[in-house]
Amino acid sequence: MAFPYQCLVARSESSADGAAWTLFGASGSKIVVQSSNGVASVWSRQAVQVLDPKDDDTQEPPGKRIKLSTPKEQKFNFSSLVLSNNGHYLVGVTGEDKCVRVFQIDAQSGLQQLSERCMSRRPSAITLTSDDSTILCADKFGDVYALPLLPSPEDEQVEAPAPALPLEEKDFTPSATVFTVHSGRNRRTLEEQLKQKAKGPAKPKEAITFRHDLLLGHVSMLTDLAFAKIGNKSYIITADRDEHIRISRGVPQAHIIEGFCFGHEEFVSRLCVTRSGLLVSGGGDAHLLVWDWRNFLLNEKLPLRDTVIKHLRSRPDLSSSFKDDASFKTAVSGIWEVPGIKETSEVLVACEGLPGLFNFNVGTGAVNGDSLSLMGNPLDVAFVQTSPNSWTTIVSIDNVHKAGSTSELRENADGARLQYFSKQVDGAWREDAEMGALVSSFALGGTDGPDLTTADDKAVRDILYHVENLRKRPGAED
C-alpha cells in the first residue's frame, strides 16, 4: 500500500496555447512531481550511514576489523509544502528534524534542494511574503521567524552566541511529594518533575548559525499564519490554540499589533485570505467565521457543523455510525479558495476524519453550504488550470484509514489516493475522469516507499491527523 499524499500544491500558467500546470505531492518523506506534458520525477532524501558507536576503532584493540552498521534511512516526513508566488521555488517543512527546505524547480519540473535549515523548535506553519524574499515560519511555542528564501553567504554564517559557562549541577529534589499535592494538575506537574530528574540534566541545544529574525510571539501554540498586502502596507495574520486571531504589521514592524479578531470559542486551526480581501477562519467551533479583518469586524458565521451533519445523513455508508447529538464536533483541517471565480469568493473546507469537502460562498450573505462526497478522508487540496477559463480540483485521499475514521484501517489496500472535480456551468461540482487519466502516473508515484502493512499505526496517524488534538479537554486545567 502506498503512503497517501499528506501535502499537495500546484502551479498553473495560462497562455494563448492553453494552460500548463505542475503538480507536487508529499508522500511521507518523498515529493512526487508531474507536469501537464507528462514529465514526472520523485525527490527523496538519501539514506544516511551511521557508524555504530560500539564498533568505534578508538575503543578496540589494534588489528581488529572495523565494522560498519547497516545503513539506516532516517525518515523525515513533510508536514507542509508552499510554492513561491513566481512558481520557481518550493518550500517544505519536515517535522521530525524541524527543517525548512527550499527547492528550486528546474525547466523539466525537477527539484533541486538549495538549502536545509533546522529550527530549534518544530515549525507549525509557513508562508511566503508577496515578493518571495522571505519565509515566515511559525512554531509550536508561539513565535514567528523570518528566514530569507535564498540566503546569502553572510546569512548562512551568522555568528553563533558564545556558549555560557557550565554551571555546577545540583541534585534536584522536588519540594512537593505525592502526599502533599491534591489537585490533578499539580500531581501531573510532580510526575513530570520526577521523570526529568530520572533523565538527568538536559543537554545544551546547538546554536542556530543561519539568519532567523524573530518577528512576533504569542503566549500559545501557533496553528496557522497568513501574509496580506494592501497597497504599500503588509500584514501578518496569526492564529493560535487559545482562540486568538492577531493582526500584526508586516516586516520590519511585525512587533506592532494592529488588533485582534475575537469571536472563536475553540482553537483556530486554519486561516484563508480571499482575493476579495475577506478572512475566513475555522477550527474547533461549529461555524466558519468571515471577517473584515482590517477593521476587526465579524461579517458572517457560516454553519459548518450543520452542513457536515446534513452530508453525513445523506450517505448510507456513514449514517448508521453517525449519532446526531450535542457531542458531535468538527475540527477544520483545511480552507481553500476556489480560483477562477470573479463574481464571488467560494471556499472549500475539510474537516479532520470526515469524507467530504464542504463549500460555501463568502461575503454574499448566503447561510447554507453544500458538500462534495469523497471516497475517503481528505488530506489536502490543489487546483490546476486546464484551460484559460476552467480549473480542476485535485483532492488527496487517505487510503490507509476507513472513510470517517482516523484510527480504523481499511481492509482494501488498493484505495484511491486522489479524486478530481471540475465546476460545471450550472455551478455544480462533478468528478473529472479526464484529469484522472492525465495524472495516472502521479497517482501511483512514491509507491516504492515503506510498507504500511508493517508500519506503526500511531506513527502513520500522527502524520495525517493532529488537528483534533488541539482541542482542550474538560478538566485539563484542574
Swiss-Prot record:
Location(s) in or outside the cell: Nucleus
Family: Belongs to the WD repeat TRM82 family.
Protein name as it appears in the record: tRNA (guanine-N(7)-)-methyltransferase non-catalytic subunit TRM82
PANTHER family in the record: TRNA (GUANINE-N(7)-)-METHYLTRANSFERASE NON-CATALYTIC SUBUNIT WDR4, WD40 REPEAT PROTEIN 4
Organism this protein belongs to: Phaeosphaeria nodorum (strain SN15 / ATCC MYA-4574 / FGSC 10173)
WD repeats: 14-53, 73-113, 217-258, 263-301
Principal subcellular localisation of the protein: nucleus
Gene that this sequence comes from: TRM82
Pathway the protein contributes to: tRNA modification; N(7)-methylguanine-tRNA biosynthesis
Gene Ontology CC terms, in alphabetical order: cytosol; nucleus; tRNA methyltransferase complex
